[in-house]
Curated annotation (Swiss-Prot):
Amino acids binding S-adenosyl-L-methionine: W58, G84, A85, G86, D106, W137, S162
Transferase listed as a keyword: yes
Function according to Swiss-Prot or TrEMBL: S-adenosyl-L-methionine-dependent protein methyltransferase that trimethylates the N-terminal glycine 'Gly-2' of elongation factor 1-alpha, before also catalyzing the mono- and dimethylation of 'Lys-3'.
InterPro entries, per the entry: EFM7 (IPR025784), Methyltransf_16 (IPR019410), SAM-dependent_MTases_sf (IPR029063)
Cell location: Cytoplasm
Native source organism of the sequence: Schizosaccharomyces pombe (strain 972 / ATCC 24843) (Fission yeast)
UniProt keywords, alphabetically: Cytoplasm, Methyltransferase, S-adenosyl-L-methionine, Transferase
GO annotations of cellular component type: cytosol
Protein name: Protein N-terminal and lysine N-methyltransferase efm7
EC number(s) on file: 2.1.1.-
Gene Ontology terms: biological process: methylation; nicotinamide metabolic process
Alphabetized PROSITE patterns for the sequence: SAM_MT_NNT1 (PS51560)
Keyword check for Nucleotidyltransferase: no
């Protein structure tokens, strides 16, 4: 067969519609329940689709942002780190509510970080004190601190985690990152908000706190709010899938 025998057949071309295209990004608005400072509505761009579920604005992130707005002293004049930030709503609210500065992190995937950067930098009044950074849980967090301008002995004051504990294989890495980020700061607080999206795995979700306690953290429940389940058609009791739980974790000074 001659070299040009396949000409016109397009054997290396996928036919139109063969592979679904990635959905385009979409914008959503978050209406703040209380507005200590900044706009009443925060605009967020969500990636069109992503294997790490960053294309949703999760109930836990909304409730964490609401908690910060209701309790702005939580972040005022504090150095704040958000892990698994997604669209970055709690980070943005923290910056508006008076945080000294905020580092908003997610898995180091260009699509995720570009979108996070877009969201956290869209408001000129907070752009200078908030940054978006790729970070892999469990890895050395010193580079994140260095990029934030930390001195050698500086650590974060406040950590924000929303809807991360469902990722059971990553619990130990998350706890390791939390400890590194606040090491030596007796006043630091880690806020952990989540929903049992898979009620039959709720006990596995809570193992996160067992690991945290074994690493020296004290645990306190601070919130329980009912919303609408993220996915109505999912299995499991809707009232469980609709509930957001909020905890705070601290490491007390050794006596």
């Amino acid at each position: 067969m001659a070299d040009n025998d396949f000409e016109g057949f397009g054997i290396f071309e996928e036919p139109e519609g063969f592979r679904p295209s990635t959905p385009p990004p979409k914008e959503v608005l978050h209406t703040r329940v209380i507005v200590p400072n900044g706009p009443e509505e925060i605009k967020l761009r969500l990636v069109g689709s992503h294997s790490l579920w960053a294309h949703y604005l999760w109930n836990s992130g909304i409730e964490l942002a609401n908690y910060i707005d209701k309790n702005p002293d939580t972040v005022r004049a504090k150095k704040v780190l958000e892990l698994g930030a997604g669209a970055g709503l709690p980070s943005i609210v923290s910056a508006f509510d008076g945080a000294k500065f905020v580092v908003s992190t997610d898995y180091p995937d260009p699509a995720l970080i570009d979108n996070l950067e877009h969201n956290v930098k869209q408001y000129a009044e907070i752009a200078s004190k908030i940054s978006a950074v790729g970070y892999l849980w469990g890895s050395n967090i010193k580079e994140v601190m260095s990029n934030a301008g930390f001195k050698d002995n500086e650590v974060f004051d406040i950590l924000l985690l929303s809807d991360l504990v469902f990722n059971h294989t990553e619990h130990s890495k998350l706890i390791k990152s939390c400890k590194m980020a606040i090491e030596g700061n007796p006043n630091a607080v880690v806020y952990v908000f989540f929903t049992h999206h898979r009620p039959h795995l709720a006990k596995k979700d809570m193992i996160f706190f067992d690991i945290a306690q074994s690493e020296g953290f004290q645990i306190e429940k601070i919130l329980e709010e009912k919303r609408t389940p993220m996915f109505e058609e999912d299995p499991g009791a809707p009232e469980i899938r609709a509930t957001v739980h909020g905890y705070k974790m601290t490491i007390p000074i050794p006596v």
